[in-house]
Amino acid sequence: MDGIKLLLSIIILYFYTYINCAIAEPNLIDQVVAIVNNDIILESELKILRDSIQNYAKLNYQEQLEDNQLNKHIIDRLIIKKIIQQQAKLSHITIAETKLNKIIHDLTSSQNLSIAKLRHLMYSNRNIYDIYRAQLRQDLLIAEVLNSALHRRITILPQEVEFLAKKIAIRKNTTFNLSHMLIPLPEKPSRKQKNEAEALALFLMAQSEKQNDFRELAIKYSTDTQMLNSFSMIGIQHTKLPLILAKHLYGAQKGSVIGPIYSDIGIHILKVHDMIRTHMSNIPITEVYARHILLRTSVKRNDNQARVQLLNIARKINIGDISFSIVAKQISEDIISSQQGGDLGWNALNAFTPTFRKLLLSLNKGQLSIPVRSSQGWHLIQLQNIRQVENTTNKEAAYRILWHRKLAEIAHIWIQEQRDLAYIKIINHHDNR
C-alpha cells in the first residue's frame, strides 16, 4: 500500500486537478488539441486543467505562467496521462468498486467526514461527487500501471538496507533536548509577508549560533504586529515529534540549528541542545514464503468462472499433472510474479490483509489454498515456508524509503520512454517529442 501512496503522490505532480473546476463550461465546441496513438485530447480537457491551475495560483498568491507556457505544460501532462491509461487497457488493469469505495472511506475517515457527508457537500457544490470518484479512479489506475511496470526495474542491495536501517534505529532510539521557535504567518500570507518571515528566520538562525536562549531571542525580536513563539522540548523522543519537524532531525548533531522549516502555520527553527540514545530490544515476527496464481475478472470471465478455473488447476497440481511454476508463468495475470512462477518471496505476515493472513496460517508447507478473492481478482496460493525472524521494522522502513526514492527516479524515466514510443501529434503546437 505504501508503494501505491507514493505513486499517487507522483501522479498528483503530473495530473493535479482542482476539483471545483472539474465541470467544463457547457456549449463549448470541442476541438482536438493532440492525438496520442489512437486517442485524442480535447480543448475542454485542457481548459479544465488550465482553469484549475490558474485558480490555485490565485488562491495561493503564486505567479502565473503565460498562457502559451501553461498550455504546453498541461498538454504534456495530458499526453502522459493518456499513454498510461492506454497501458492500463492493454494490461486489462481495472479498479474494482470495492477498492475505490474503501479508499474513499479511508480518505474521508482521516478527515472525520463520512462518505454521505462528502457526497452532500459535493452535491451542494456543483454536484461533483461522481466526477471526484471518476478522477480518483483514474489516479488509482495510473498508480497500478506504474506499480506493475516499475516493480521489476528496481534493485535494492542488502547492504543499502542494512546501512539505512542502522541510521533509522539510532534515530528512533534517540531523545532530544530542543529549543523551538515559530514565526507565525496568517492563513493566506502575501508574498511580502512570506519573504519578510523567511528573512527574519535566517537572521534568527544566525543569531542562535551565538545565543542558546530562544526565549530571549523571541522577546527581543517580537514586534506589535508579529509575536514570535518559543518553547523548549526536553527529553522528547524522535518518534513523538510532529513529522514535519522529525524528518529534519535525521543527521542532526548536538548544537545544530535547523531551519527554516515551513508549515501551514508559519516558519519553524529548531536548535539541538542534547541527544540521548538508548537501546531497544527486538521482538520476533512471522514471515511467510508463498507463491500465487492470479486470475482477474472481466467481461469474458466472471467470478464463478475464475474460481472454477483455479479449482481445476489446483486439482491438476495436486495429482501431479501440471507444475505450479509453469502454469503460473502461462496464465497468472500478476505480471510481476508470473515471470518467477508466481513466487512472492519472503514477506512479513502482517503485510497481508487479515483474510490472507488467516488463510496462510491455516496452510501446511506445500499445501494449496482454496481460490480466494481480493480486489485484484481470484488467487490460488501455495505456502512454501514459514519462519520466525528478529523484528525487521527498521529494515522494512529502510527498504520502503529506498524503494520510494528509486521509484520516483525511474518513474520519470519510464514515462519518457513510453512517450518516445508513442505516436503524438500536437495540433497547432510544436511537437516536442
UniProtKB/Swiss-Prot annotation:
- Coarse class of the primary localization is periplasm
Q: Which residues form the signal peptide?
A: 1-24
Give the molecular function GO annotations.
peptide binding; peptidyl-prolyl cis-trans isomerase activity; unfolded protein binding
Protein's cellular compartments: Periplasm
Q: What class of enzyme is it?
A: isomerase
Q: Where is the PpiC domain?
A: 173-274, 285-385
Which cellular component terms (GO) are annotated to the entry?
outer membrane-bounded periplasmic space
Catalysed reaction, written as an equation:
[protein]-peptidylproline (omega=180) = [protein]-peptidylproline (omega=0)
Q: Which InterPro entries match?
A: OMP_Chaperone_SurA, PPIase_dom_sf, PPIase_PpiC, PPIase_PpiC_CS, PPIase_SurA, SurA_N, Trigger_fact/SurA_dom_sf
User: Any idea of its EC number?
Assistant: 5.2.1.8
Q: Which domain of life is it from?
A: Bacteria
Which Pfam families does this entry report, sorted A to Z? Rotamase, SurA_N
Instruction: Please provide the record's keywords in A-Z order.
Output: Chaperone, Isomerase, Periplasm, Repeat, Rotamase, Signal
Entry keyword tRNA processing: no
One Gene Ontology term from the biological process aspect of the record? protein stabilization
> What's said on domains?
The PPIase activity resides only in the second parvulin domain. The N-terminal region and the C-terminal tail are necessary and sufficient for the chaperone activity of SurA. The PPIase activity is dispensable for SurA to function as a chaperone. The N-terminal region and the C-terminal tail are also required for porin recognition.
* Function in brief: Chaperone involved in the correct folding and assembly of outer membrane proteins. Recognizes specific patterns of aromatic residues and the orientation of their side chains, which are found more frequently in integral outer membrane proteins. May act in both early periplasmic and late outer membrane-associated steps of protein maturation.
UniProt protein name: Chaperone SurA
Annotated source species:
Baumannia cicadellinicola subsp. Homalodisca coagulata
What gene is this protein a product of? surA
